[in-house]
């Protein structure tokens, strides 16, 4: 069964790839809508979650009801933490794999995000008609925004401005421990402790928490309460003037106000704090006349700070759709034209230069990338209405070795269900959780590096190293580990090498370098002034510098060649973990490249290098390649055959 409700905004054009499915899945109901164009949300329907065994069944029922046979892109806001592929709902019995659900429904993209993360993304677009201010002054533009809301659970999120966009915070703040502020709330806590080993704000401040408060106050007054009383009935009684229900609502709103004030202080939410969820909205004037605002401001020395922060009650009917639509649009924009997916950008840039037949393959890749990834070449050719050789020519036009190589690169560009973002490790994570996050973050950074690494710069660096008279590796602090590793690899090539992790030794040695010498400088920040001065001295004497660092740093700008390794771990206060792995990988790439060059180069080399190369036979150089674990020497192959 579903309740039909439709909402349609002003038409702003149609999505070229067809309507997008939007969903807002709560503990009780699942709401679905179609977005046929930017801002055009229609066919909103609500389905009780208990009526459907799985989320896939609910989605199929909706698509059948609205007579839509094909959806390419979908996004779901769900009342649950989302961390990885498997989602198991806390307040409902649905459990599903995001990727398996995407495949089962035939979507190209399926995003699943926390519902309050989605709601947070809707806040900047709310109009005055979609919110009611409850106290406070004027919100500060381009400042942090707080969000919380009681529904089946207590959602908490925030919105942080970053240049011309917003970043939503994923949070489970509703599970913070409840802290009573008066004797009445002490009674509520004591009552709740009899039922729950840990009493969080969600236990007393979400929808079901109103029943806890009601029963606690009834026990205080020695009143008998029906076994079936629920939040809806309590709110109805309060509107009818029932004294116990009114006190329950007042206590509930006071606790919510105190919690909202804590959220505002924690986030520094000068852009305002918004209250979403269904409970506060149903309270109506009972909420606006309650002690919510007074308790929001009651923070002792910081009362004046909070007096100026406005609080808003969200009145928009389906605000989560606006937020999840914005998140999906940003992901698809990144895929087709953003910096996070180089392969899609390359297709767009080269499209006009392709033949008409190759353009059809390009359009298939842009609009239906999953089809390219999953289908065999015969099906790809059929869908694009081209020959199979045309598919191969298209892949090679993009610089790929063939279809398999193109599929791999295309898959890494799909951010819809492949984890390409940084997952935070939290206190209390199990070894399984934090171990998976550390590995996923590292893998994500490596895939990003592969997509964005300038291989022309890599070739130039290998050329410089292969012709070097002497190579010195400089790294300070944690980067010295990378420098030492590089020294151990490169000394096997017969080139004089050394690694220095001390500034005084670097300065003394750099003063002796000249033409034909190379320094490989490894630095996460690329800003150490002492290191930069040392490199300036060496470069003025004719030495070349290869920098392994972050983009747009002073080191990257000074170096002869810069190999840039950007990633999420960018704060100076952080110990280099991911950056160390990326820097070590860059050394591996350079070492393998030099090993291959020295095994195959027949051109002229500097005299000292030529003599060293003469002392190392091709077999010995191949042994070095095998030693680097990226090749197999003839001897190793013989052993394998034996």
UniProtKB/Swiss-Prot annotation:
Residues 1-340 are annotated as: Glucokinase. Signal peptide: none annotated. Residues 341-417 form the HTH rpiR-type domain. GO terms for molecular function: ATP binding; D-glucose binding; DNA binding; DNA-binding transcription factor activity; glucokinase activity. InterPro entries: ATPase_NBD, Bacterial_glucokinase, Glucokinase, Homeodomain-like_sf, HTH_RpiR, RpiR-like_SIS, SIS_dom, SIS_dom_sf. In the N-terminal section; belongs to the bacterial glucokinase family. This is Bifunctional protein glk. The lineage of its organism: Bacteria, Pseudomonadati, Pseudomonadota, Betaproteobacteria, Burkholderiales. The gene is glk.
């Amino acid at each position: 069964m579903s309740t039909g409700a439709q909402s349609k905004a002003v038409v702003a054009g149609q999505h070229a790839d067809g309507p997008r499915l939007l969903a807002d899945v709560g503990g009780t109901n699942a709401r679905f809508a179609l977005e046929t164009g930017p801002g055009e949300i229609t066919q909103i329907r609500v389905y009780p979650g208990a009526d459907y065994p799985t989320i896939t069944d609910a989605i199929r029922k909706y698509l059948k009801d609205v007579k839509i046979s094909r959806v390419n892109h979908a996004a779901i806001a769900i009342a649950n933490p989302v961390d990885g592929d498997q989602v198991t709902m806390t307040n409902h019995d649905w459990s599903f794999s995001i990727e398996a659900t995407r495949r089962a429904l035939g979507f190209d993209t399926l995003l699943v995000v926390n519902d309050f993360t989605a709601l947070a993304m809707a806040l900047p677009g709310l109009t005055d008609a979609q919110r009611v201010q409850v106290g406070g002054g004027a919100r500060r533009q381009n400042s942090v925004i707080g969000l919380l809301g009681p529904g089946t659970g207590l959602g908490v999120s925030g919105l942080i401005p970053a240049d011309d966009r917003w970043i939503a915070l994923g949070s489970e703040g509703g599970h913070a421990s409840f802290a009573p502020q008066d004797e009445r709330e002490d009674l509520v806590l004591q009552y709740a402790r009899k039922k729950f080993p840990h009493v969080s704000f969600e236990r007393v401040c979400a929808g079901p928490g109103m029943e806890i408060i009601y029963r606690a106050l009834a026990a205080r007054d020695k009143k008998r309460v029906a076994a079936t009383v629920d939040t809806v009935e309590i709110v109805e009684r309060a509107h009818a003037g029932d004294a116990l229900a009114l006190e329950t609502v007042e206590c509930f709103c006071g606790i919510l106000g105190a919690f909202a004030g804590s959220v505002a202080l924690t986030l520094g939410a000068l852009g305002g704090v918004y209250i979403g969820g269904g409970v506060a909205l149903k309270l109506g004037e009972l909420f606006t006349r309650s002690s919510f605002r007074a308790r929001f401001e009651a923070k002792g020395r910081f009362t004046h700070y909070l007096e100026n922060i406005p609080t808003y009650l969200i009145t928009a009917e389906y605000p989560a759709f606006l937020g999840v639509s914005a998140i999906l649009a940003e992901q698809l924009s990144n895929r087709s034209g953003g910096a996070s997916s180089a392969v899609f950008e390359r297709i767009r840039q080269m499209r006009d230069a392709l033949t008409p037949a190759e353009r059809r393959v390009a359009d298939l890749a842009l609009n239906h990338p999953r089809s390219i990834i999953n289908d065999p070449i015969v099906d790809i050719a059929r869908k694009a209405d081209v020959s199979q050789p045309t598919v191969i020519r298209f892949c090679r036009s993009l610089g790929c070795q063939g279809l398999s190589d193109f599929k791999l690169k295309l898959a890494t560009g799909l951010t819809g269900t492949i984890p390409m973002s940084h997952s935070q490790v939290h206190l209390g994570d199990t070894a399984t959780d934090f171990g998976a996050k550390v590995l996923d973050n590292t893998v994500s950074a490596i895939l990003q590096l592969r997509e964005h690494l300038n291989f022309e710069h890599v070739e130039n660096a290998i050329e410089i190293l292969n012709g070097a008279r002497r190579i010195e590796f400089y790294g300070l602090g944690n980067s010295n580990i990378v420098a030492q590793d590089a020294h151990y690899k490169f000394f096997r090539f017969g080139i004089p090498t050394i690694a220095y992790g001390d500034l005084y030794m670097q300065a003394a040695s750099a003063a002796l370098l000249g033409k034909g010498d190379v320094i490989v400088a490894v630095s996460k920040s690329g800003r150490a002034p002492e290191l930069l001065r040392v490199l300036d001295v060496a470069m003025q004497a004719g030495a070349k510098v290869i920098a392994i660092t972050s983009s747009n740093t002073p080191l990257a700008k000074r170096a002869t060649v810069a190999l840039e390794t950007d990633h999420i771990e960018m704060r100076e206060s952080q110990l280099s973990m991911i950056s160390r792995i990326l820097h070590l990988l860059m050394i591996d790439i350079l070492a393998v490249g030099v090993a291959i060059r020295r095994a195959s180069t027949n051109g002229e080399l500097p005299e000292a290098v030529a003599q060293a190369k003469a002392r190392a036979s091709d077999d010995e150089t191949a042994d070095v390649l095998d030693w680097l674990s990226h090749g197999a020497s003839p001897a190793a192959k013989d052993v394998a055959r034996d």
